[in-house]
Design a protein with these regions (language model features):
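Short amphipathic alpha-helical segments
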Residues: 1, 23-31, 57
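C-terminal helix-cap and adjacent tail motif
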Residues: 3-12, 157-188
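A short N-terminal beta-strand-loop micro-motif at the entrance of redox/enzyme domains
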Residues: 12-28
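Small-aliphatic-rich amphipathic alpha-helix that forms the alpha element of a beta-alpha
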Residues: 29, 33, 85, 102-146
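Glycine/small-residue-rich phosphate/adenosyl-binding loop
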Residues: 41-114
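Short secondary-structure boundary segments
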Residues: 89, 137, 163
Length: 188
């Protein structure tokens, strides 16, 4: 699939077939994430691959209910997918210069770096016929305990990964005219 076609056709997947994801396919997807750009090439993103049912269930239990919608639909996806990938960031690298924050964004640059890497990952997965969904509403402390994450790392995101049970229909998107301004905010 061409890149733009993959972007247009990718959907958030929460229901998966039981079919396993082989190591070769998984490594292609992880390699796409590894190649993502990062602040000053710090490459602060790390990935933890989980296949264990016990650990996937513990991660699913860490997912928080949505304040307005109730149960988070990602919970079932984390339990059912053959693979879950957790993305973490090494703190104090991204957005730093000579050991100090380089901008007023401080240590939050790692969120951008992980986001870029994870988008590479989900697009590569979609290109290979696999499904994912970005999951960020979870109890970070619980996930850190489950996965034995050191203090100098931060859990940013996780995604279930597997073959979709079905392909959801496209969700509505805002028109470019609604989201693009010229020269300054609000100027069409």
């Amino acid at each position: 699939m061409e890149t733009l076609e993959t972007i247009k056709n990718r959907r958030s997947i929460r229901k998966f077939k039981a079919d396993p994801v082989d190591d070769k396919t998984l490594n292609i997807i992880l390699d796409a994430a590894r190649l993502a750009p990062s602040w000053s090439n710090t490459q602060c993103t790390r990935f933890i691959v989980i296949r264990s049912t016990e650990i996937k269930n513990a991660l699913a239990d860490s997912i928080l209910a949505h304040p307005e919608l109730g149960n988070n639909p990602a919970t079932k996806g984390i339990r059912a997918a053959p693979v879950v990938i957790v993305a973490i960031a090494e703190k104090g690298l991204s957005g730093y210069f000579n050991g100090k924050p380089a901008t007023n964004k401080g240590d939050y640059w790692y969120m951008l770096d992980v986001g870029i890497a994870m988008e590479n990952l989900v697009l590569a997965a979609a290109d290979l016929g696999l499904g994912t969904v970005h999951v960020g509403l979870f109890d970070c402390s619980k996930v850190e305990d489950i996965l034995k994450i050191p203090e100098n790392y931060c859990v940013v995101e996780m995604t279930p990964l597997g073959y979709p049970e079905y392909q959801p229909t496209p969700r509505p998107r805002k028109a470019l005219e609604e989201i693009v301004y010229k020269e300054e905010f609000g100027k069409k």
